[in-house]
Swiss-Prot record:
<feature type="modified residue" description="Phosphoserine">
    <location>
        <position position="76"/>
    </location>
</feature>
<keyword id="KW-0808">Transferase</keyword>
<keyword id="KW-0597">Phosphoprotein</keyword>
<protein>
    <recommendedName>
        <fullName>Ribosomal RNA-processing protein 8</fullName>
        <ecNumber>2.1.1.-</ecNumber>
    </recommendedName>
</protein>
<dbReference type="GO" id="GO:0035064">
    <property type="term" value="F:methylated histone binding"/>
</dbReference>
<feature type="region of interest" description="Disordered">
    <location>
        <begin position="1"/>
        <end position="81"/>
    </location>
</feature>
<dbReference type="GO" id="GO:0016433">
    <property type="term" value="F:rRNA (adenine) methyltransferase activity"/>
</dbReference>
<dbReference type="GO" id="GO:0033553">
    <property type="term" value="C:rDNA heterochromatin"/>
</dbReference>
<feature type="binding site">
    <location>
        <position position="185"/>
    </location>
    <ligand>
        <name>S-adenosyl-L-methionine</name>
    </ligand>
</feature>
<dbReference type="GO" id="GO:0005730">
    <property type="term" value="C:nucleolus"/>
</dbReference>
<dbReference type="GO" id="GO:0042149">
    <property type="term" value="P:cellular response to glucose starvation"/>
</dbReference>
<dbReference type="Pfam" id="PF05148">
    <property type="entry name" value="Methyltransf_8"/>
</dbReference>
<feature type="binding site">
    <location>
        <position position="267"/>
    </location>
    <ligand>
        <name>S-adenosyl-L-methionine</name>
    </ligand>
</feature>
<feature type="binding site">
    <location>
        <position position="238"/>
    </location>
    <ligand>
        <name>S-adenosyl-L-methionine</name>
    </ligand>
</feature>
<dbReference type="InterPro" id="IPR042036">
    <property type="entry name" value="RRP8_N"/>
</dbReference>
<keyword id="KW-0805">Transcription regulation</keyword>
<dbReference type="GO" id="GO:0000183">
    <property type="term" value="P:rDNA heterochromatin formation"/>
</dbReference>
């Protein structure tokens, strides 16, 4: 290749000769010279690094598919399974899935565990067992429950008899079985505890507002709480006398003199199918314009107006009523005329109040 020379200006451009050059790539860039690769230098081995690797290998030996706690490769399968079972049990203990195994206790020849106690502790345990062997809380609870069920069952039976028979048959029932009265009132006390209010307390509050000279007759008094709660003279009457100051009699035929009472009280005592005889007796013993207080369970009244008409036939006019109170109705009647005891009239009653088994 001839070197590129610049011709003199006087010779002109015709004499300039160019040597063709083969283009590379797109014909624009000149052909590049290939670069020479430098040979890589080999790194020198570091003795300390090999030493650390050897120490780590000595400290931990690994088995394919196992963790750092796996047994070495040269160990037998039995040894490996024992170690694996121990690790698995350890994890179960930590996670709370199983309890820690307790060390086995020493057993006697018969296979039973032997418990060694000091003599004073053994004597104290023996005394405690003898003291509690006769009565235990569980036994007492069961006996109390059975006794309560028996009491409730007998109360329901007696209650049904009193509501579905006449007062004379109820009197015969209590005369035949003297313990029936106590059983009935024991069950009655249990029912009172379940009521939202005790209607007798309201009547007591009303009686305390009348003059202390007023004479009161408590018909079907039960345990005679009214006489103990007011300062007035009270004649407490029921089929069975729970106390010495209670008159045992049929409230349709009392021993009181005619026209001696100022107030007659019937608190949850309108039981039986002959209520007409109840109020004919009340008319006999009450003074003219005497007052009758009645408290009864709401569900027993099918028609309040019919009940008022029946008492009107017995000589009483309605003075006041409170049927808005939940669960109980309260009435106040006044005796307006005398009605002979032997007056014939249709018997009437209220719906029976039968307690269901709970």
């Amino acid at each position: 290749m001839k070197p590129f020379e610049v011709p003199p200006w006087e010779e002109g451009a015709d004499i300039i000769e160019f040597e063709p050059v083969n283009p590379s790539g797109n014909g624009v860039a000149a052909k590049k010279k290939p670069k020479k690769k430098k040979p890589k230098k080999k790194k020198a081995a570091v003795p300390n690094e090999n030493l650390n690797v050897n120490k780590a290998a000595e400290k931990f030996t690994y088995r394919q598919g196992r963790g750092p706690l796996a047994p070495p490769q040269d160990s037998s399968d039995d040894d490996y399974e024992d170690v694996e079972d121990g690790i698995r049990a350890m994890h179960k203990v930590k996670s709370g899935r199983i309890e820690k195994q307790r060390p086995p206790t020493q057993a006697t020849k018969g296979g039973k565990k032997e418990l060694k106690l000091k003599p004073e502790l053994a004597q104290a345990a023996l005394e405690a067992m003898e003291a509690t062997s006769s009565t235990t809380p569980a036994a007492n609870s069961l006996a109390s429950k059975l006794q309560s069920e028996l009491l409730g069952g007998r109360f329901r039976y007696i209650n049904e008899q009193l509501y579905s028979t006449t007062s004379r048959k109820a009197e015969a029932l209590f005369r035949k079985d003297s313990s029936a009265f106590e059983a009935y009132h024991a069950g009655y006390r249990q029912q009172v505890e379940k009521w939202p209010i005790n209607p007798l307390n309201r009547i007591i509050k009303t009686i305390k507002k009348i003059p202390k000279t007023a004479i009161i007759g408590d018909f079907g008094c039960g345990e005679g709480k009214l006489a103990q709660s007011v300062p007035n003279k009270v004649y407490s009457m029921d089929l069975v006398a729970a106390r010495s100051d209670i008159i045992a009699c049929n409230i349709t035929d009392t021993p009181l003199q005619a026209r001696t009472l100022d107030v007659a009280v019937y608190c949850l005592s309108l039981m039986g199918t002959d209520l007409n005889e109840f109020f004919l007796e009340a008319n006999r013993v009450l003074k003219l314009h005497g007052t009758v207080y009645i408290a009864e369970i709401q569900s027993r009244f099918q028609d309040v107006r019919e009940f008022v008409r029946c008492l009107n036939a017995c000589g009483f006019d309605l003075n006041k009523k409170d049927v808005a109170v939940n669960y109980f109705y309260f009435f106040q009647f006044k005796k307006m005329r005398h009605v002979p005891k032997n007056t014939k009239m249709k018997a009437f009653s209220l719906k029976p109040c039968l307690y269901r088994k709970r």
